[in-house]
Amino acid sequence: MPYEPPTHTVERSLRATTGAKIIAGVDEVGRGAWAGPVTVCAAITGLRRPPVGLTDSKLLTIKRRTELEVELRTWVTSYALGHASPEEIDAMGMTAALRLAAVRALGTLPVRPDAVILDGKHDYLGAPWRVRTVIKGDQSCIAVAAASVLAKVQRDKMMAELGVDHADFGFADNAGYPSPVHKAALEERGPTPHHRLSWAYLDALPQWRHLKKVRSWVEGSVPEIEGQLGFDF
């Protein structure tokens, strides 16, 4: 299937139908991971021409994704990241954790967006935000595609840092997602403080079941990676 670059079609539609001037694209990464936070990026891009090759982060090679992320950090008008920790995910469930991370990201932006374009079918953000959901928005919408790349690369960096003290789990390679190395380490060593104990696979490990919800999230264990704050509107 030939590459079709994302466009500003959704942004233009929102401007025309709602009067919104400042529109943020929002995407998440880490939803299906066994370990680490779920991360949401909110990116404001305006209507400028995007960097060449911008698309859903999952469709890019690691090399190209990393190069593009560097370019995006200075190309976007502004962006910010929000995280929900494994402990928060265990306590409230994924939908509420996604909302928490998204609210944190949007609240870190230098201005409040008039509208939000959310990747996917379901609106996990809700009122009071004006939300337009777009299936495969990370492929079709420029602002969401930018958020996708920024979120993915920066969460991957975060997981690599967390993996320094947990080398057997392969966080630098699997970013906390299921993998044979990750599975073997869990079965041998049990979960780290960065694991989601409510996830079905971890919950089913009988030798570690006594640890379920009996751990505290270590303050500052998730490295701070700030979003760029800009006012170039």
Swiss-Prot record:
**Which residues are noted in the entry as a divalent metal cation-binding?**
D27, E28, D119
What's an example GO cellular component term for this entry? ribonuclease H2 complex
Q: List the Pfam families hit by this protein, alphabetically.
A: RNase_HII (PF01351)
Subcellular localization is given as:
Cytoplasm
Q: Which UniProt keywords apply?
A: Cytoplasm, Endonuclease, Hydrolase, Manganese, Metal-binding, Nuclease
Primary location:
cytoplasm
**A single MF term (Gene Ontology):** RNA binding
Among SUPFAM superfamilies, the record links this protein to:
Ribonuclease H-like
The reply on keyword Nuclease is yes
Query: Do you know which NCBIfam families this protein is assigned to?
Result: PRK00015.1-3 (NF000595)
Query: What family is it from?
Result: Belongs to the RNase HII family.
Q: What is this protein called?
A: Ribonuclease HII
